């Protein structure tokens, strides 16, 4: 991979469940078709928004396979495949590739609180175990550790299949360093919907978005407008959907976005424990915003 090719709008796809808590495969296929119709560039099942900690390896395999089948070459499929045990993360990566993933999203090892060298070695083992491109997922608000820019850049330079980072932080200094120092093949994607506009203005490559579950066309348009330098249009889109982007995190992701999708008639509102439904107060706030935007 001598050139950068991960860019645009990616969706961190929810996992729909039936009332009996099995995966709703019919709803999953509908969600994928909704993304394809909107022109989403990358579809990512089995990540944080997909409730991956509650999915068995067999379920993850089946979800990735269904998404890959439904996409039918119209987008890239990047599977969430990470955990805090390096051997297990390698096994998840191999499982995702076997299921048909075109690339992998691998979360930084959480809870263990590894050193930067430990993080480097974790990703080294994954990169040496598979040949598909890997997206480092840096989300210190969930993992309890930040993958430093120096570590990300070291990995990108040492392994050609370390292809991108999902930088789910508001650390603009780190983002700036990554954008300025990265090798040619390496993409930098934001994981913060609220930062799409400033991130793209800094030279970012795109977003891995939660809101794209609800408004994939609009997120795609926002990214494209910012990429092309049409800041007036980008600001218009950002202004219109700013409140929704904020409400998606009024409680733990993916609870708000799954509630919104249920109100939009796309999935049933079911979560696997320890996630529970939204409070009545927050449901009302989301209902009001969805109505205001004409989404329900």
From Swiss-Prot:
- What compartments host this protein? Cytoplasm
Q: Name one Pfam family in it.
A: DHDPS
According to its UniProt record, which reaction does this protein catalyse?
Answer: L-aspartate 4-semialdehyde + pyruvate = (2S,4S)-4-hydroxy-2,3,4,5-tetrahydrodipicolinate + H2O + H(+)
CDD domains for this protein: DHDPS
EC assignment: the record states: 4.3.3.7
Positions annotated to bind pyruvate: 49, 208
Record's superkingdom? Bacteria
Where this protein primarily resides, as one coarse class?
cytoplasm
Signal peptide (from-to) = none
Q: Where is the active site?
A: 137, 166
Pathway linked to the protein: Amino-acid biosynthesis; L-lysine biosynthesis via DAP pathway; (S)-tetrahydrodipicolinate from L-aspartate: step 3/4
Site location (Part of a proton relay during catalysis): 48, 111
Name the SMART domains for this protein: DHDPS
GO terms for biological process, alphabetical: diaminopimelate biosynthetic process; lysine biosynthetic process via diaminopimelate
Naming one, the record's GO cellular component terms include:
cytosol
Query: What InterPro entries does the record tag this protein with?
Result: Aldolase_TIM, DapA, DapA-like, Schiff_base-form_aldolases_AS
The answer on whether this UniProt entry bears the keyword Protease reads no
Q: What are the entry keywords?
A: Amino-acid biosynthesis, Cytoplasm, Diaminopimelate biosynthesis, Lyase, Lysine biosynthesis, Schiff base
Q: Which Gene3D superfamilies match?
A: Aldolase class I
A GO molecular function assigned to this protein is:
4-hydroxy-tetrahydrodipicolinate synthase activity
Give the similarity note: Belongs to the DapA family.
Q: What does this protein do?
A: Catalyzes the condensation of (S)-aspartate-beta-semialdehyde [(S)-ASA] and pyruvate to 4-hydroxy-tetrahydrodipicolinate (HTPA).
Describe, as the record does, how this protein assembles with itself and its partners: Homotetramer; dimer of dimers.
Q: What is this protein called?
A: 4-hydroxy-tetrahydrodipicolinate synthase
**Annotated gene:** dapA
């Amino acid at each position: 991979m001598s050139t950068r090719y991960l860019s645009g709008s990616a969706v961190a796809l929810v996992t729909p469940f039936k009332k009996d808590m099995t995966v709703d495969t019919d709803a999953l296929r509908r969600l994928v078709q909704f993304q394809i119709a909107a022109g989403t560039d990358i579809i990512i099942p089995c990540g944080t928004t997909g409730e991956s900690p509650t999915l068995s390896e067999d379920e993850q395999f089946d979800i990735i396979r269904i998404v890959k089948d439904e996409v039918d070459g119209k987008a890239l499929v990047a599977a969430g495949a990470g955990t805090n045990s390096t051997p297990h993360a390698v096994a998840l990566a191999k499982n995702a590739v076997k299921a048909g993933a075109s690339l992998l999203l691998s979360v930084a090892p959480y809870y263990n609180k590894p050193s930067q060298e430990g993080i480097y070695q974790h990703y080294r083992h994954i990169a040496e175990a598979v040949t598909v491109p890997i997206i480092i997922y840096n989300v210190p608000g969930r993992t309890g550790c930040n993958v430093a820019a120096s570590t990300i850049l070291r990995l990108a330079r040492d392994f050609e299949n370390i292809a991108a980072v999902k930088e789910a932080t508001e650390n603009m200094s780190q983002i700036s360093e990554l954008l300025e120092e990265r090798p040619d093949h390496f993409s930098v994607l934001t994981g913060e919907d609220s930062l799409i506009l400033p991130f793209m203005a800094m030279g970012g490559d795109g977003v891995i978005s939660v809101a794209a579950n609800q408004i994939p066309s609009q997120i795609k348009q926002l990214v494209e407008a910012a990429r092309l330098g049409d800041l007036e249009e980008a600001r218009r889109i950002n202004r219109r959907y700013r409140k929704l982007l904020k409400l998606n995190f009024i409680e733990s992701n993916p609870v708000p976005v799954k509630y919104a999708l249920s109100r939009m008639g796309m999935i049933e509102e079911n979560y696997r424990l320890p996630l529970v439904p939204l409070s009545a107060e927050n449901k009302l706030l989301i209902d009001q915003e969805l109505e205001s935007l004409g989404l329900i």
